[in-house]
Amino acid sequence: MEQRVLGGRYLLKDKVGTGGMATVYRAQDQVLDRTVAVRIMLPQYAGDATFAARFKQEAQAAAGLSSPYIVGVYDWGKDGDTYYIVMEYLRGTDLKSGIKSHGALDPKKVAQIGSQISSALSVAHKHEIIHRDIKPQNIMVLPDGNIKVMDFGIARAKNSHLTQDNNVLGTAHYVSPEQTRGQDLGPTSDIYSL
């Protein structure tokens, strides 16, 4: 990969993965000398004002949340036509991949993971933020066995209408009934997905 620096600060190292809205890279923060993850909005969405607003909203929403079970967001920016979010770099595997590799979890582990996700959602809900896409792929299991909720990409502040467009966003197997009907969402929508 060609060396690229975003915002005059974040040196992209290698691609970690690609999702529905963005590609994630491991990067080096050249100011604070630490490894970070940088989510770069996919080019096909960069010209779409709604997606750009949603991307910025994710950064703002997640940056205001403080929990040991939520991935930390450090920065947001635009470099030319590239929108990016800088966040905590996590080592581990997403819950879905972990279950595929190692099989079903024992009930004690399920309870621990459920409790930690609930704690993360409680923090988000106290800030009136609804995740809207709780699913195993958005739960990172760390080497110590704890989890972090990731990808607030379609999260929305409960009182925000900035990106409300009556589109159904979320993953079919996990969305709440009210989400499929395009109705107003609340904390119970995330709990249903959990």
Language model segments and positions:
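AlphaC helix of the eukaryotic protein kinase fold
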Residues: 40-64
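Activation segment signature within eukaryotic-like protein kinase domains
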Residues: 113-114
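Conserved catalytic-loop aspartate of Hanks-type protein kinases
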Residues: 190
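Protein kinase glycine-rich loop
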Residues: 12-19, 24
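Activation-segment/catalytic-loop signature of the eukaryotic protein kinase fold
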Residues: 76
